[in-house]
Amino acid sequence: MKRVVSIVLLLLLLPALPAAAPGTGAGGGLTVSAPSAVLMEKETGTVLFEKNARDTGFPASVTKIMTMLLIVEAIESGAVSPDDVVTASERAASFGGSCVYLEAGEQMSVHEMLKCIAVVSANDCAVAMAEHLCGSEEVFVRRMNERAKELGL
């Protein structure tokens, strides 16, 4: 399962690589097309490059990566099984944007929900899993923030 998550994460992050890799611009500086970026040296924490580093951005689907991590960790700990059935709530079914159009009461396995989150970036499945794992979206968000702190993010 860890290998699957690693592959999914790699596939999700691959589109960002061309934007960061073109090389140098005129004058020898790094050229980055992203609206903001920070490059730091791992050992010392020295900032090697920054562009709009203090700007606030929105996490978008990056939160789905944390959602998938918590799902996989719940599977590995035995808290849930990939075959467990998840029932979509009215709230989960009401989410738009990237979704698989779950209907309230619709049931899918944890494994299927995880695939929908990874492949489609399904908001409805992410909310259904949050509710399944933690009882509510709010408690799940707190758990994501705790886990992010544990990881030093």
Can you say where each PLM-predicted feature lies in the sequence?
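N-terminal Sec-pathway targeting helices
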Residues: 1-6
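Bacterial N-terminal signal peptides
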Residues: 7-16
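Active-site-adjacent loops and short helices of periplasmic peptidoglycan-processing enzymes
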Residues: 19-153
